[in-house]
Amino acid sequence: MGNQLGTLKKEEVELLQNSSHFDSRELRALYKQFRKDSPSGTINKQEFKEIMTQMGVGDQFLQDLLFNVFDKNKDSTINFQEFVCGLSSITRGTPEEKIEFAFSLYDIDGNGYITRSEMESILESMYKLVGTFVTCSGKKFDPHDLIEEFFDSMDDDGDGYISLEEYKRGTLKNPDIIQGLKLLNQ
């Protein structure tokens, strides 16, 4: 994406506007910075981790998860389109886009289901970042309590796995999760 001169073509801008929540001015500014940070036009995992660290996301496990979600075509690099779409989902996505993004983070192996083991890995990593979890009601949880509550409220069919549809339904019923998704807009 982008021509030899390092600028976005009109068609590329239109494509990205249609697949993101950024306008043409923002896309051009993002592209300029992206090309400055990565003249090759792609970001490898190490470069992505450096960018995430600069943005305040220092946990390596979380950086790996984010990289895997951004890298849609699974070629071990992130191109500009993947970067824009991932950034758009996190920062400006609709509630449904944010729910799907979060599900992709939790579904570490990409099989379409969240397991207790995957949730435990995620929450332990997040717990390291924030130290404790507090809900909107002020109630504190440790990661294992959250996992139990998470599966109790979302695993509708009781099979020990949470599908995307179960996750969507459960998320929309949980004010703590909705509040967390809103925080991503700030």
Curated annotation (Swiss-Prot):
Chain sites annotated for binding Ca(2+) 2: D155, D157, D159, Y161, E166
GO molecular-function term, one example from the UniProt record: calcium ion binding
Limits of the EF-hand domain: 40-58, 66-93, 94-129, 142-177
Family designation: Belongs to the recoverin family.
Top-level taxon of the source organism: Eukaryota
Keyword Repeat: yes
Annotated protein name in UniProt: Calcium-binding protein NCSA
Binding residue positions for Ca(2+) 1: D107, D109, N111, Y113, E118
The entry's keywords: Calcium, Developmental protein, Metal-binding, Repeat
Function text: May prevent cells from entering development prematurely in the presence of environmental nutrients.
